Amino acid sequence: VSAGSTVVRYTDGNGCEVDQSITVHGLPNVSAGSDQSICSGESVTLTASGAATLSWDNGIGATNPATVSPTSTTTYEVTGTDGDGCVNTDQVIVTVNTVPSISGSTEVCAEGTITLSSDITGGTWDSDDDGVATVSASGVVTGVSAGTVDITYTMSTGCDDTYSVTVYAKPVLSGTLTGIANGSTETLTATGTPASSNPWTSSNTAIATVNSTGVVTPLSTGTTTITFTNSNGCSSTASFV
């Protein structure tokens, strides 16, 4: 029945009549607000309107606006009562989306790569500084220069995770390994702190050896690769011909 006023008449068996005026009040236009979407761990504010007295379910009560932090998708219902005692309800759904979690190494050398992964598929990767490191669509991080970079993995819901990666500089070698006569030596130098164990190595010690301070001693004709590794595990090479 729609809101308004009417008169109800009662007539008894003797033809006697009595009239009663009745007013029908409309229901309050209660609103719980629009449905909302949040990421796991976030809060959202619910604001109801449309009635003199408002009360939420789920243990919220008369608090309005109300801040809630659901751990899973939840429907909240608000009950509104107007000044005439008429009652109406409305609902709002708060969808809780899962936040991805990145895993993988936190260190990479310049010109080196590491692969990061997420526990949820379907997101996109991004680097906040391509001058320090780039990241591919599959999570492969390539070091560019020394520094720290934040790698972010974002879902279509907007939920994301950020992972900090440190890029270490690649050592720079100095010295000449071409045309060294047998019986002579050449000392290579490198930038950075040497690794604590075997910082200098030769790929073929029958051709040339190298000691812990970078002194290369040729032994026979041929080619070998001299490698220096720094304390961060980053390495550079030079060829002895």
Language model regions located:
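Solvent-exposed segments in extracellular or luminal domains encompassing
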Residues: 1-7, 64-77, 138-148, 214-223
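Extracellular acidic loop/turn motifs
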Residues: 53-55, 122-125, 192-199
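Conserved structural position at the C-terminal beta-strand
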Residues: 10-12, 80, 153-155, 228-230
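A short beta-strand segment in extracellular, disulfide-stabilized domains
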Residues: 42-50, 111-120, 184-192
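C-terminal edge beta-strand
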Residues: 18-25, 88-96, 161-167, 236-241
